[in-house]
Regions:
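Membrane-interface helix-loop junctions and terminal tails of multi-pass membrane proteins
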Residues: 1-297
Length: 297
């Protein structure tokens, strides 16, 4: 669905406007309006479909992302192989569907142009893909209180990548994105390898950076990012305890009066503690004693 919507927008943007080689460079790729139009279409389509399918398959539509998850020890190899196969088949189906439904040729193939060599295009694809994958690692793979917004960040990362790469390589960032239209068109450009080598190198770069951050325990550099230090939303009976908890987290000395008042309200460290019931002293009484428990005859 992601690629079908994106390919359709490319076709709507005009035949031979982008991604079509005429001489040595894509035609019309310098038009800012077209660049923004294509970039917005790909990023919004990806963000929406990641949000839809996040609970189903993890919202993965990119073999480079799948490989990076394997390298980051976040996905088994067998499952990754099945995902990559499904992604490639889906890209062919999406390109074929767009070509069959819309009039004229699809014109969604990517190609290196505008004075850029294939090697330069490969490295550009590598860095742009690495940026996208690092965004996925830090927003979706690493769980935090803003994880539910990960699709927005992923979509924006793809948007920026398209702004940079469309003019030079068509901004694939995804082997499946370049493979599907080539199969549907029945023609592979000689630089097709750029759109496999570049994104997969980006997978290694992003996974290596992610594992380095995990090894260095990046959480310690900026701790307590997921701790809610706001007491305004707490109930009145809990605000004293919340204030004491916040001061303790920030390393400040907590006045004894604050803790005592917090305990009086049956709240300690932000959690309710049931009041202790008074204990009745136990007095041992001998069976042969004629005295009562108060000590009087």
């Amino acid at each position: 669905m992601f690629l079908f919507m994106a390919f359709s927008v490319v076709s709507v943007s005009g035949h031979r406007v982008l991604f079509v080689r005429e001489g040595d460079s894509p035609v019309g790729a310098s038009d800012p309006t077209v660049i923004l139009y294509i970039a917005l279409a790909f990023s919004v389509s990806l963000g929406i479909n990641v949000w839809i399918f996040y609970r189903v398959s993890g919202g993965m539509f990119n073999p480079a992302v799948t490989l990076a998850l394997v390298l980051g020890n976040n996905m088994p190899i067998l499952r990754a192989a099945m995902c990559i196969l499904a992604q490639l088949v889906a890209s062919i189906a999406a390109a074929g569907l767009a070509q069959g439904l819309l009039p004229g040729p699809l014109n969604a193939q990517t190609t290196v142009g505008n004075g850029m060599t294939n090697v330069e295009g490969m490295f550009l694809e590598m860095f742009l893909t690495a940026q996208l994958i690092i965004t996925i690692f830090m927003l979706a793979v690493e769980k935090h209180k803003a994880t539910f917004l990960a699709p927005l960040g992923v979509g924006m990362a793809l948007f920026v990548g398209h702004l940079v790469g469309i003019y030079y390589t068509g901004a694939s960032l995804n082997p499946a994105r370049s493979f599907g239209p080539a199969v549907a068109a029945g023609h592979f450009y000689s630089d097709q390898w750029v759109y496999w080598a570049g994104p997969f190198l980006g997978s290694f770069l992003a996974a290596g950076f992610y594992r380095l951050l995990k090894f260095l325990q990046y959480e310690a550099a900026n701790p307590d990012q997921d701790v809610d230090l706001s007491c305004s939303a707490r109930e009145d009976s809990n605000r004293l305890a919340c204030t004491a908890e916040r001061m303790a987290i920030q390393g400040k000395d907590v006045p004894r009066s604050t803790w005592s008042r917090s305990k009086d309200s049956d709240v300690e460290m932000g959690s309710s503690i049931p009041p202790k019931s008074p204990q009745t002293p136990i007095v041992a009484v001998s069976p042969n004693s004629t005295d009562d428990i108060s000590g009087h005859a």
